[in-house]
Amino acid sequence: MPPKSRTAAGAKKVRRKEKKNVAMGEAHIKSTFNNTIVTITDPTGAVISWASAGTVGFKGSRKSTPFAAQMAAEAAGRRAMEHGMKKIDVFVKGPGSGRETAIRSLGAIGLEVGTIQDVTPTPHNGCRPPKRRRV
């Protein structure tokens, strides 16, 4: 099979990032035991910016720290503020250690935090949980 060559017609199309002017939005913080992911959307749910502890530069077990969650929230919040965001409602999901620090850092960079809701999914005795960890 001949190697694929890139031509002008077959080149990847890169979409330009357009400046959305959104004053109010939602911050979805997913905090697991291993990582923290912060996604900022407009009220309809379209993603404006996102960051995780891994994209900010933390690797391995350092991703699960509250400081990594703080840095991820600041990075996502600053990118959202470039699009004109001023006020956010926060939705927190998961049991991780970076929940509170992520919320605090969103307020510290200048975003006005409105409501804070915990949307962690809890089973009505559905799937069997993983076995207990023995160290």
From Swiss-Prot:
Span-the-membrane segments of this chain are none
Q: Which InterPro entries match?
A: Ribosomal_uS11, Ribosomal_uS11_bac-type, Ribosomal_uS11_CS, Ribosomal_uS11_sf
Alphabetically, the GO molecular function entries are: rRNA binding; structural constituent of ribosome
Q: What does this protein do?
A: Located on the platform of the 30S subunit, it bridges several disparate RNA helices of the 16S rRNA. Forms part of the Shine-Dalgarno cleft in the 70S ribosome.
Chain's gene name: rpsK
Q: Name one GO cellular component term.
A: ribonucleoprotein complex
What name does UniProt use for this protein?
Small ribosomal subunit protein uS11
One Pfam family this sequence matches: Ribosomal_S11
Cysteine pairings via disulfide bonds: none
Assembly and partners? Part of the 30S ribosomal subunit. Interacts with proteins S7 and S18. Binds to IF-3.
Q: Please name the source species.
A: Nocardioides sp. (strain ATCC BAA-499 / JS614)
Using the UniProt annotation, give all residue ranges assigned to the region (Disordered): 1-22
